[in-house]
Amino acid sequence: MTQVTIGENEGIESALRRFKRQVSKAGILRDLRNHRHFETNLEKRKRKAVAMRRNRRKSMA
């Protein structure tokens, strides 16, 4: 769980920026998007195969 403690002289904007940064580093939103819908094993394999092809093309270019 991501927590941010606010200092005495710290503004809410800077605390919110730190919170957003921690959430993005932890990959919480990406994980939430991946688990939004159930994905069968076949769908996972297809998605990973497409990603591998895309990465291979990108590395060749």
Swiss-Prot record:
Family: Belongs to the bacterial ribosomal protein bS21 family.
Species this protein is from: Synechococcus sp. (strain JA-3-3Ab) (Cyanobacteria bacterium Yellowstone A-Prime)
A single GO cellular-component term on record: ribonucleoprotein complex
Pfam families: Ribosomal_S21
GO biological process terms held by the UniProt record: translation
Entry's Gene Ontology molecular function annotations: structural constituent of ribosome
Keywords on record: Ribonucleoprotein, Ribosomal protein
Name this polypeptide is given: Small ribosomal subunit protein bS21
Entry superkingdom: Bacteria
Family annotation (HAMAP family): Ribosomal_bS21
The keyword Translocase is assigned to this record: no
